[in-house]
């Protein structure tokens, strides 16, 4: 009988029915993209800082020239140049600040993705807590629901016990999508739709 088998063996067989490799690969690709974006951001930051230093030097030089030869300069033209340089300096400083904020946001998102990957790996390994083994060994559906919930998806059953509704939460955007599941569409279709909604 099913209950005569060792719970650890049942869990091992149940885990074999799940394939989290695509999720791991997707997270790896995201990590690679974030790393590339981080490198690009650092390069743009260096360029922005270099341009800011250059403009600061130019501004200082023009200020010195103004003080030394104010009588030989067109005051209106010089004032316009100063305003233009100040405007450029402000724009570059603002761009540098925005890049720094974006970097912090991406770092937070990367940490969140790493935590999610760790959760997925933990759910796919043997050696869970004893209470968890006892509770989940009897019902593989609980394992699936927990994995979905860890990804931000809550599956709801109707009165007949059929899963007919999914609530998808995008923590990055703070969005919530409710999907009524129609049996005429395949599980593959809904898996792709759920994933794109979480990433959107």
Swiss-Prot record:
Compartment list: Nucleus; Chromosome, Centromere, Kinetochore; Cytoplasm, Cytoskeleton, Microtubule organizing center, Spindle pole body
UniProt cross-references to SUPFAM superfamilies, sorted A to Z: Kinetochore globular domain
Record has Cytoplasm as a keyword: yes
Domain of life: Eukaryota
Keywords: Cell cycle, Cell division, Centromere, Chromosome, Coiled coil, Cytoplasm, Cytoskeleton, Kinetochore, Mitosis, Nucleus
UniProt record, GO biological process: cell division; chromosome segregation; sister chromatid biorientation
Annotated coiled-coil segments of the chain: 39-129
Entry's transmembrane regions: none
One cellular component (GO) term of this entry: cytoplasm
Role played: Acts as a component of the essential kinetochore-associated NDC80 complex, which is required for chromosome segregation and spindle checkpoint activity.
Summary of subunit composition and partner proteins: Component of the NDC80 complex, which consists of at least ndc80, nuf2 and spc24.
Family the UniProt entry places it in: Belongs to the SPC24 family.
Protein name: Probable kinetochore protein spc24
Organism annotation: Aspergillus fumigatus (strain ATCC MYA-4609 / CBS 101355 / FGSC A1100 / Af293)
UniProt gene name: spc24
């Amino acid at each position: 009988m099913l209950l005569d088998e060792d719970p650890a063996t049942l869990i091992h067989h149940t885990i074999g029915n799940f394939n989290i490799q695509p999720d791991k690969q997707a997270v790896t690709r995201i990590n690679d993209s974030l790393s590339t974006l981080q490198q690009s951001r650092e390069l743009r930051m260096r360029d922005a800082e270099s341009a800011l230093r250059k403009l600061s030097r130019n501004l200082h030089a023009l200020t010195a020239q103004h003080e030394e030869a104010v009588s030989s300069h067109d005051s209106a033209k010089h004032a316009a140049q100063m305003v233009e340089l100040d405007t450029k300096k402000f724009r570059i400083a603002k761009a540098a600040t925005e890049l720094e904020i974006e970097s912090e946001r991406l770092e937070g998102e990367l940490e969140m993705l790493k935590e999610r990957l760790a959760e997925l790996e933990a759910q796919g390994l043997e050696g869970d807590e004893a209470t968890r083994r006892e509770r989940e060994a009897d019902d593989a559906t609980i394992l699936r629901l927990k994995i979905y919930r860890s990804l931000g998806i809550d599956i709801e059953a109707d009165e007949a016990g059929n899963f007919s509704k999914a609530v998808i939460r995008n923590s990055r955007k703070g969005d919530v999508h409710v999907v009524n599941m129609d049996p005429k569409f395949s599980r593959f279709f809904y898996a792709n739709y759920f994933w794109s909604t979480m990433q959107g």
